[in-house]
A protein has these predicted regions:
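Membrane-proximal basic amphipathic "stem/tether" segments
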Residues: 1-56
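N-terminal pre-P-loop "Q-motif" helix
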Residues: 63-66
Length: 246
């Protein structure tokens, strides 16, 4: 697949610091792009109005541009594109992707208000409710599933669902990330893509913590580098994107 040569000719794979995602997206999109505003504000209340006003996400701008670029490439090559996100928190990443795409459908999996902190889960902050996130995103082109990720993924498999791009951003222990990845595998189309968050050894203190804990997402993606069935497409900030080859 000629994703790099066709739409990413500016050092996309290497993640060079002089590469401007914002400039690239504006030049590439015929219908424009909405500037991402994704910095958290601890003083803001957990309201639907706040969710509608911004992109509540812990992804950097570059990370969102990267996922969007892959999604838009897929939109160019097929009629409908299916995106799956495991661990959506407030839905900010899906909101960003939805507002800047035309022919993609989005499925998000999360525990939402049912989440309870535990020793084996790296998440600990307050979660939005499923109703809040759905009202913020709108139900057009969006499906939200509440429950434990592996079980939700199995349910999707039973319904013969397939996805073109899967983004795994749930529990960041190695064990949980691997379980989410393995449960997602049957859902990824041939030549589809799977992306992981928090898998850079030096990008943030969070990532360093996950690696020290049990290897975290970084260890799993490092293992995929040696897997002949997957090809690393890009690594930007804390996100790595792989293409499924078989």
């Amino acid at each position: 697949m000629k994703i790099i040569k066709s739409i990413l000719p500016y050092g996309f794979v290497s993640g060079k610091s002089n590469f401007s995602f914002k400039k690239f997206i504006k030049n590439f999109l015929p219908f424009g792009i909405v500037a991402a505003v994704n910095k958290r504000n601890a003083d803001k209340r957990y309201t639907v109005e706040y969710l509608k006003s911004t992109y509540v996400s812990d992804l950097t701008d570059n990370e969102k541009w990267l996922l969007l670029a892959v999604l838009l490439y897929l939109e160019r090559t097929q009629k409908n594109t299916e995106y799956l996100e495991v661990g959506i928190y407030a839905g900010g990443t899906i909101k960003f992707m939805k507002e800047n795409s035309k022919n993609s459908n989005f499925t998000g999996v999360d525990l939402f208000e049912d989440f309870k902190p535990s020793d084996d889960n790296t998440h600990f902050w307050k979660n939005y409710t499923q109703a809040q996130v759905w009202e913020s995103l709108g139900k057009d082109r969006v499906t939200l599933l509440k429950g434990f990720s592996v079980q939700c993924l199995k349910n999707l498999q039973e319904k013969n669902k397939l996805f073109d791009l899967v983004f795994i951003d749930g529990n960041h222990t190695y064990k949980a990330t691997k379980e989410d990845f393995e449960a997602s595998l049957p859902l990824i189309r041939k030549n589809g893509y799977v992306a992981f968050h928090n898998c850079s050894p030096g990008a943030s203190e969070e990532d360093k913590y996950y690696i020290k804990l049990d290897g975290g997402p970084w260890m799993l993606t490092h293992e995929l580098l040696g897997n002949p069935n997957f090809k690393l497409v890009s690594s930007i900030d804390r996100v790595r994107v792989f293409q499924k080859l078989d």
